[in-house]
A protein has these predicted regions:
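Active-site HxH/HxHxD metal-binding segment of metal-dependent hydrolases
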Residues: 1-70, 84, 89-91
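Short, charged, surface-exposed secondary-structure boundary motifs
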Residues: 47-51, 103-104, 266
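Metallo-beta-lactamase
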Residues: 65, 75-193
Length: 266
């Protein structure tokens, strides 16, 4: 919001590629603060007001426009957004968790589809990539939803932006290395169980959540040392240490859990 104001711009739409599992996206709070509608692609069934776009639908933003590409596979509602410049030429694509740099999004088992197996999701993803993304122009700029370190993929490149031309060479999903059968096997073999909080995040992103400001207001309250000592007598209390790993190693409170927030988020 601050960046938009500094540039004299208005946030017109909030585009969601899918129901995220690894974080709460903040889309509802942003929509409330800006009056911008939330956009999802086909198959999304949120419990709040939004626009469910059709595959191929365009949204105009000033002199540019964005085309919705339904690219299921990571999830059934996953989509990518193709940006056209002022000359009506494809300029960039925002691929969410469908296509990463050097990798693709693994089937999102956190959503636990009743009628769709991980193998079927991988097969659908193969079709999405080969029919919707691979045919696009080589000079297209690719902006994926994650960089290296995310649990939504396995072998992502450390870079966060690339051209589709480079990905057609360096990404196994685009360079013809695998046929569909081998692709499905590669993507689903030894697939790890998702972190325990993933299904909760999916539900929050789909059904709604408490505003972040309210969460902070309720949670970020100072306590003195005596109050702290009393609180930790309760076995249900969990202590999270968010300092650097260096500081945690030097000393930490007994039984505290290290989750250092050092500015690097995948």
């Amino acid at each position: 919001i601050q960046k938009a104001k500094s540039r004299g711009a208005k946030i017109k739409y909030i585009f969601q590629t899918h129901f995220h599992a690894d974080f709460v996206s903040g889309h509802l709070t942003l929509s409330k603060m800006t009056d911008a509608p939330i956009i999802y692609g086909p198959n999304a069934k949120p419990d709040y007001k939004c626009i469910i776009a059709a595959d191929g639908e365009f949204f105009e933003i000033g002199k540019i426009k964005i085309k919705v590409l339904h690219t299921p596979g990571h999830t059934l509602e996953s989509c990518s957004y193709l940006l056209y410049n002022e000359n009506n030429e494809p300029h960039a694509i925002f691929t969410g968790d469908t296509l990463f740099l050097g990798d693709v999004g693994i089937p999102d088992v956190a959503q636990r589809y009743k009628d769709t197996t991980k193998e079927e999701l991988a097969s659908i993803l193969y079709d999405s990539i080969n029919t919707k993304i691979k045919p696009l122009v080589d000079n297209l700029i690719v902006y994926p939803g994650h960089g290296a370190g995310s649990a939504c993929g396995r072998n992502m490149m450390k870079e966060t932006v690339d051209t589709l031309k480079n990905q057609k060479v360096n990404n196994y999903a685009l360079n013809g290395k695998f046929n569909k059968e081998d692709f499905v096997k590669e993507l689903t073999e030894n697939l790890p169980e998702p972190p325990a909080y993933f299904p909760l995040n999916v539900r929050l992103n789909q059904t709604g959540y408490m505003d972040f400001d309210t969460v902070l207001e309720n949670s970020m309250k100072k306590i003195n040392s005596d109050e702290f000592k009393e609180l930790i007598k309760n076995p249900q209390i969990v202590i999270l240490d968010t300092r650097s790993s260096k500081d945690f190693i030097k000393s930490h409170i007994k039984d505290s859990i290290f989750i250092g927030l050092e500015g690097r988020f995948a």
